[in-house]
Amino acid sequence: MSMAEGDTLISVDYEIFGKVQGVFFRKYTQAEGKKLGLVGWVQNTDQGTVQGQLQGPASKVRHMQEWLETKGSPKSHIDRASFHNEKVIVKLDYTDFQIVK
């Protein structure tokens, strides 16, 4: 039995540009990721952006990508979201969704 595309495990890196630091963006990203059952990480960069990696079923990752592009935390202002290094994976590299300091 083959898995549907929506159930295929994928990994994707992301970087979010805009007013995304000092507005609890990482905390909300972690909470949304966990709610969707995704694993990965999120951290602030020295350039004022937020970056990280998402892993999980493709359908859930797509949902999270849309959330990162359009929603974020209540006080954030997202200019744009960049997604790269997307690939199909056999197993998850993480066990949780973490905030990296």
Swiss-Prot record:
Which reaction equation describes what this protein catalyses?
A: an acyl phosphate + H2O = a carboxylate + phosphate + H(+)
The highest taxon in the source lineage is: Eukaryota
Found, by tissue, as follows: Organ-common type isozyme is found in many different tissues.
Q: InterPro entries, alphabetically?
A: Acylphosphatase (IPR020456), Acylphosphatase-like_dom (IPR001792), Acylphosphatase-like_dom_sf (IPR036046), Acylphosphatase_CS (IPR017968)
Active site positions, chain numbering: 26, 44
- Entry keyword annotation includes Cytoplasm: no
> In the record, which positions carry N-acetylserine?
2
Write out the GO MF terms. Answer: acylphosphatase activity
Q: Which family does it belong to?
A: Belongs to the acylphosphatase family.
Protein's name in the database: Acylphosphatase-1
